[in-house]
């Protein structure tokens, strides 16, 4: 009789007492999502044909949203971005982060290890030994080979695949220790750098859980973790699609303003909690913001003469804490995914919590219009776009930066007659000109975004202040309340 395979773990990894210091590369762009997927990496922008420059901005955004020249070799890939399975995400993450790292001598062969089959109950032990007769197996890249019907830890039964990325894979499981509740299990590759990044993320998630016992602050909930034969595994609550994936599947039709308002309020609420606990996320983007439930209804838009998907419930969770940094920790020079990276990071002036506020401003614009505000992957062009949209960079920031190669006599060095110069000139305009309507609530949204997109981080609005902004006066009492969810403990 055929038996499904049950895996048991060796002794838990004793890293809980590990005092950690974050180590990241000097130049990192981790763009990577549980149901959580990653970004494509198209050819470098300089290699495009001249005909490409004539592609409309929104279409070019869809095709080249994710390119960048920065690399990150020592981060935890996006929780929301690499899993919950967007093909866009997986393609980009593979091209970005698959490097010459190998932890075994024979990198091109599968690796098998025998499992243990000990159990406290004798009958359970006999069943376990039969189901563990097959070896634990890794593929050539260190991914755990597992199938629907397999078990891990005599607890998690795999019932579906949610996605695979550079860091590993995510599978949907039934947690038999908790009444067959559904969870998303993130299984990290058996590779040292990813294992270490997962340990750092687990420590951050544990700190968040300690501070938010009732799960009122909308951060993704870790319910369990364990080391399975070198694979760090993290169990999370099962959530819906990430907000970028939903946007993409809706043909990049922007979210309605009431949806933008509710998601913005939740984002400010969640990130204020992190900031008050001396933690900066550093990698906020639509991929790392997940719907609790992404069920939708299809509506006909008479104005656009097309059908649109409208999510039924705009409750969200913030995910991917693999790069989150406490105030007392070392702050690397480069943080944040390119499109959401603030000027102080590009100019290497140092960063803190206002870094997240800038990212939220960029995210809100993307929700509102359906495309990124700063569609670029090069520092100089990025700064030029900022000036075209937001006005001149403050002189004191120019004087302080070490990146003087971008400036001459206090101004950006830029050729407006080049193909890149023409592109920026044609497609970047003052922020308010992107408003779809002149009604009060649209004006209020753009006022909030402009305050979040202040060049000087010292002048940028704080999230405590943002929550009091008039834009949020239109929220319903239900939207202002945050219902606690079940918070399972280890």
UniProtKB/Swiss-Prot annotation:
The lineage of its organism: Eukaryota, Metazoa, Chordata, Craniata, Vertebrata. Belongs to the protein kinase superfamily. CMGC Ser/Thr protein kinase family. Lammer subfamily. Residues 156-472 form the Protein kinase domain. Dual specificity kinase acting on both serine/threonine and tyrosine-containing substrates. Phosphorylates serine- and arginine-rich (SR) proteins of the spliceosomal complex. May be a constituent of a network of regulatory mechanisms that enable SR proteins to control RNA splicing and can cause redistribution of SR proteins from speckles to a diffuse nucleoplasmic distribution. Phosphorylates SRSF1 and SRSF3. Regulates the alternative splicing of tissue factor (F3) pre-mRNA in endothelial cells. Residues 26-56, 63-76 have a biased composition (Basic and acidic residues). This is Dual specificity protein kinase CLK3. PROSITE patterns: PROTEIN_KINASE_ATP, PROTEIN_KINASE_DOM, PROTEIN_KINASE_ST. Its main location: nucleus. It comes from Rattus norvegicus (Rat).
